[in-house]
Swiss-Prot record:
The gene is lexA. Its EC number is 3.4.21.88. GO terms for biological process: DNA repair; DNA replication; negative regulation of DNA-templated transcription; proteolysis; SOS response. NCBIfam families: lexA (TIGR00498). Belongs to the peptidase S24 family. This is LexA repressor.
Length: 207
């Protein structure tokens, strides 16, 4: 394989390090921040050189789709299979706001975090602190499996009677539904009707 420049080596080694730690590659922005490059076009240029020299492979149709090419000169790398999951608007964990019902981006997740059919999975960004006692914090990404039913105690994404989306713990009571926040300073939401969008099956948090 052709020799790398100092900057190309820095980028290549950073990509390998992130893959080894997280199981998936960094974004262009993260690469730039790590090696001190403010211009994303400059980072793209270095990635193109790495690809031309046979160190990486990329899929231009997907974000973060950088694959380390192994050969005799490279360390063995265990890169976990990733899937690209749609990120759909934002869901309020607090005062509900109307969810944006379109795909904002696709986010790569290690396959083990989904544990179900990939086509049924989507991600929502959490806004607010009503679920903090369940370990769901403002800015987290909740991994959601699409489904329209729920059992008491499930953490769900629901549409309220005002067509607003929210993350809460679900309870069906005698004549109503209770959407219970996991924050002792907040009151539950009581509804005559509630539409379950999906069940929260996982959580992703960037450290």
């Amino acid at each position: 394989m052709r020799e790398l420049t100092k900057r190309q080596s820095e980028i290549y080694n950073y990509i390998k390090q992130v893959v080894q730690m997280k199981g998936y590659p960094p974004s262009v922005r993260e690469i730039g921040e790590a090696v001190g490059l403010a211009s994303s076009s400059t980072v793209h240029g270095h990635l193109s050189r790495l690809e031309e020299k046979g160190y990486i492979r990329r899929d231009p149709t997907k974000p973060r789709a950088i694959e380390i090419v192994s050969d005799q000169t490279n360390d063995n790398i265990n890169m976990e299979e990733t899937i690209h999951v749609p990120v759909i608007g934002k869901v309020t964990a607090g005062v509900p706001i109307t969810a944006v019902e379109n795909i904002e981006e696709y986010f790569p997740l290690p396959e083990h975090l989904t544990s179900t059919h990939n086509s049924d999975i989507f991600i929502l960004n959490v806004v607010g602190d009503s679920m903090i006692e369940a370990g769901i914090l403002d800015g987290d990404k909740v991994i959601v499996r699409s489904q329209t039913i729920a059992e008491n105690g499930d953490i769900i994404v629901a549409m309220t009677e005002e067509d607003e989306a929210t993350v809460k713990r679900f309870y069906k009571e005698k004549n109503r539904y209770r959407l219970q926040p996991e924050n002792s300073t907040m009151e539950p939401i009581y509804l005559d009707n509630v539409a379950v969008i999906g069940k929260v099956i996982g959580l992703y948090r960037e450290m």
